[in-house]
Amino acid sequence: MVRMEPRGLTSQEETENDDGDFRLRRRHPLTFSMPPLFLLLLLSSIHASAADDICIVGSGISGSSTAFFLTNYTAPISAQLRVFERRDRVGGRLATVSVAGDTFEAGGSVIHPRNLHVRRFADLLGLAARDDGEGDDDWLGIWDGARFVFSTLPPPPPGSSWLRRRLHALLNSLLLLRRYGLSLFRMDSFAQEMLKKFLLYYNDFESRPVFDNVEDMLKWSGLYGLTQRTLEEELIDAGLNSQTISELVTVITRINYGQSVSISGLAGAVSLAGSESGLWAIKGGNWQLAAGLLKTANATLHLQEGIDSISDAGDYYVLKSNKGHEYNCTVTVVATPLDEVNITFTPPVSIPPRKMQHTHATFVRGLLNPKFFGLSSVSDIPELIGTMELPDIPFSSISVLKKRNQHDMTYKVFSRAKLDDSLLAQIFSTREETIRIDWPAYPHYHAPEDFAPIILDGKHLYYVNSFESAASAMETGAVAAENVARLIISRLPLGLRASPLLSSEKRCRWSS
């Protein structure tokens, strides 16, 4: 993790890298031709910054991607790139949790095979795919609060032959087909049509405009209409039957977005795509993507320093932090949802009201209680329990993260509200360790969606997370960040890099 803090007004800056080593980074020499009193005042405020700084608020995938694209697409610039993070770690909603010595994803968990930016980031940073099998649950049970209305087959024993595993997959496909019929293919076609349009955001620069508002960005790709109707409306028009929507589709949206099929169509389509095969994650945690991008961008990272206010000072913005420091920035990028952070803007900015959907992730080392599910044995409980949209069901999903033996497992429970100990005592027969995390994970989607501006003030105050009202995922954050970086470059005299690390030509090759 990069940790860089200003240590004084010198011509060099000492910085710490991931290994705890220090290096010297050359900065522009300072020429002192000012009155001594002014010089003393300047030296007494070592956290004041030059007015040509570019500042990013938030170190999650949106903020780190913005930093990366800005430095990757431009020639070396004299501006200092600062990234502010109010927590003590980078990654935003990408984080891990440790249970019994094992590490699991606590936030954004999976990456789709056609998430082309994130794929390239991982390759560029030398990050390996996780190989521990988390997220590979294929024993699905759909619970209605009283019984399992549908279940796939239990997985074959470890070490089973290729033929047995293929036969198992075939039988599960037949079970799904028997229950849901042609709606399975229509559901897949709906998700694939969305992905086909989304892939347009990887086109080369000559055929892909820079967008200054989300509406035009979505209309250009043909995705805007999906944000104006509910997922349920879209799927009915696509020919899906009511059983598929109320069971299978609902399970997927409750797991991925903690919401029902009344979410907007684009968010729903992204959710359906997130249930496909081939999903993967970064070994050691997806947060490493953000950390690596910030390091590659040579960003000055201010950990545990949140921004309290952003004021327009004419040719630059004054950012005041919760540590009492001020930073002068010609460009300011807000890369965190403004819905639950208290940043004061002067003059005020106007964005549509938006609620964030909180997902409570509860990690439990212990054993599920089969009687709670109307079963006689733990071995009868599916490894992924999805739930229907019914008022008396207290959780969205339960999944097995690791099975040490028949009496010792680690589970992840998603719910819309905190699960208290009395309820957990009913769901689990034993609990050795319990960890609770409350995430303002994504917007509460509704149709028609209304979008905040990308440019908040008509000048150089940008908001990456405005795109999140269309859909929220690691890749959508990266796509929105690339557009903001290109927008900044198009509006400032920044020279383009001759051979960026992430070129549009390479992106085209990935999609083939």
Model-inferred region functions:
Residues 49-62:
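Beta1/beta-strand and adjacent pyrophosphate-binding region of the FAD-binding site
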Residues 31-48:
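Cleavable N-terminal signal peptides of Sec/SRP-targeted secreted and luminal proteins
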Residues 329-331, 336-497, 505-510:
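C-terminal segments that line or cap access tunnels to active or ligand-binding sites in enzymes
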Residues 71-99:
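Glycine-rich FAD pyrophosphate-binding loop
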Residues 62, 66, 89, 339:
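Conserved Rossmann-like nucleotide-cofactor binding loop
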Residues 100-200:
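Dinucleotide-binding Rossmann-like beta1-alpha1 core, especially the glycine-rich loop
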Residues 311-327:
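Conserved beta-strand-loop-beta-strand element in the redox core of flavoprotein oxidoreductases
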Residues 181-316:
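Active-site/ligand-binding neighborhood in enzyme catalytic cores
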